[in-house]
Structure formats: structure tokens, C-alpha cells
């Protein structure tokens, strides 16, 4: 097996994920592995190193993103051909194999294109383009004042967030805001606990900055947890929201432990039984919660506008460092979004999306019952944009995913399952309603 000399130091502060990445890069640069070499599977390497599959998978995926590896469906991970690197003269010549055609995608991060008011959005973009005075500069580093004022009002009504425009920082996506937050918190805070499963990209970002990363459950809070907890009250990977009482308990615990809660309100507006629960930030005293909001699922994934609400103490620190940052989000899109929200267009759009996704949620659950019966168990479905299922089978989640792909259906395996049954996620955002039943019939054919 390749990578037999890969050794991990589990006593050092360097994360295991980073050690794997560095070791593979070193072997590549030293000509110990070459273009076309096939790496051990995630399962095999994690077993050999006696670590979690998630750690290996995150390392492999980061190397894919950086261009060092290629992930070929049904075949595995291969060393990519990089110019400037030495190659073995006898390196096997591999032909790229076309991935299986995906007809039904339950694993995409897109939106239903028919759900977005493209013409209306174009109208607001055109209006923003007429503001030549604002467009001639780089924009406000903290984000356009007009948008921050609008967001303060909107988030108060929609999510119960209590803040002033001055507390809001705009950025091109959550990751850019997390980078700012890391700079604000260091060196006082250099460790974080995240829910599992959670936002893997956030975990990689904190890890890459040398932070110690732990996992926790909101059901089991410990006094020994770090002073920063990354919380998604409407966790998209769990398909359920924290109840008001659970949120109050979490806030009480954070106050007692003098811990910051980093609230990622991803999908917080999508709850299908009862009204969405108010944000943690709005239920708090305003000093313990850092709030993150995004428009990637409300509007477009390509609309790179997210925002962060800082408590007063961290806002002071941000102002001390503010001169170091330029705005990463488009001024044109910020101005267009401000007008879009102020005119009530976003509120009406979210209302339509709730109806659309609630209907898809119901159709998917009904079809699962009709087609699979007791062979699947819906673990969670009350909020978010996925259903989380347990499949009554001896197969692993990876095997279920592979067999589904062979039959033209893409799904997401779940790696944090605490039960004996494999679990998967089915996203119903991008799939058409009339494709739900045929897609599930293909899954049944693939699995049973």
C-alpha cells in the first residue's frame, strides 16, 4: 500500500489532518509517489493510521482542492500530474474515466433555478450601476452603510437579531468573515469546539491557523470546552432545530462559562412545522453571541454576501484592526441587495421558498414511505434543506453512496452516525418535484 511510511504524531499540537497533507506533499516532492499513483482508500488509510475517516477524507479533499490529487468516482484518489515535479519514468499511464452520468442529484448545493426572481434581481443590479459616485471607489471596508442599516432592520424582524448597523461586518462568504474573527480573537482565544457533523470548511480554516479543534454536542455540554463554540441551531446536517428551551440552556451555560457562541444561522429561516425559532443572538444579552448570516440559500450561491454581528467588546477589537481589511464583497451587489430587502422583495421571496421547500419535504417523505417502507428511517426532517435517513441494511454509507452513483443518483453519506445503521442525507433543493419518485425507485434498485 502506498503511504506506508506515513507517520502521525498524535501528541503534537499540529492537527492530524494537516500532518497527512504535509506528508503526502513531501512524498510527492521527494518523488516517493508520482502522477497516476493511486492512494489508499479513505477507509483503508484511516484504519491503518487508527484515526477517523473524516480526518483522512478532509485531508484528501483539501489536496484535491489544491490540485495535488484527483478524485475519480468508483476508482478512488490519484496523484495529479503537476508541472515542475519529477515523475517516475515507469509511472503508469492512466486514462481519465468519465464519471457516471448523474440524473438525479440529492447532494447538490445549488438552488432550484425556477425559484429565483432573476428579472427582478437584474432590475436592482441595474439601479445600483447608476450610482457612479459609489462605484468609483473600493467601497467601505466594513460593508456599505446602506446595506448594514437594511440588514439590521431585516435580521431583527426575520431572525430576532438585536444589533446596530455599526455592529455588522459584511464579507464575501462566511469563510472571509471567519478569517477576520480569527484575527480579532487571537491570541486570547486559539481553540474552538464545533458540532459534529458541522461546517467542514470552517473546521479546516481554524485548523489551518493552528487552532485546537474539538467536537461537541449541544446535548452534552462540558465545563472543559474551549471559550469559543461554533453552533448551528438549525444544523443542516441534522435536519432539526434547537428548541427555544435548548437555546436558553445553551445561552445560560455560555454565560456561566464565559464562553462565546459563534452562531451560524445557516437555513435558520427554513422550518416547516411552526414558525422559525428566533436566533440565539436575539435571545442573549448581546455580549456572548457572534452571529453569522448568509444569502447563499435564500437567493443565490453565487451571491457572495454574508454578514457577521459582533458583540461590543469584539467590535472594539475589530475597529483596532479594521484598517488591515479591504471589502471582499461586490459594492454593486451590496447596493442591489439593500434595495431588494428594503422593498420587501426578500421577505416575499423567502415566503415562496418556504412553501416550495415544505412541499418538497413532504413529497420526499411520503415517497420514501411508499417505496421503501420500513427499510428506511427518517431521522430528522423538521427544518433545513435535507432529510437525514437511516437505511436498514448491512452495507456501509460509502457503499450505499457508490451504488447510488452507479445508478445515476448522487447522495451524501453521513460519517458521524452514532447508531448501528448507515445514514445518508438527501437534499431536496435542486431536484424537481416530478423527479423525486423516479430517483427513489433508482435508489431502491441500487440498494435492494
Each model region followed by its residue ranges:
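Short glycine-rich anion-binding loops that position phosphate/pyrophosphate groups of nucleotides
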Residues: 111, 233-236, 297, 431
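Helix-loop "lid/cap" segments that line or gate small-molecule binding pockets
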Residues: 151, 307, 334-343
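Conserved core of the PLP fold type I
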Residues: 135-258, 262, 268-270, 275-287, ...
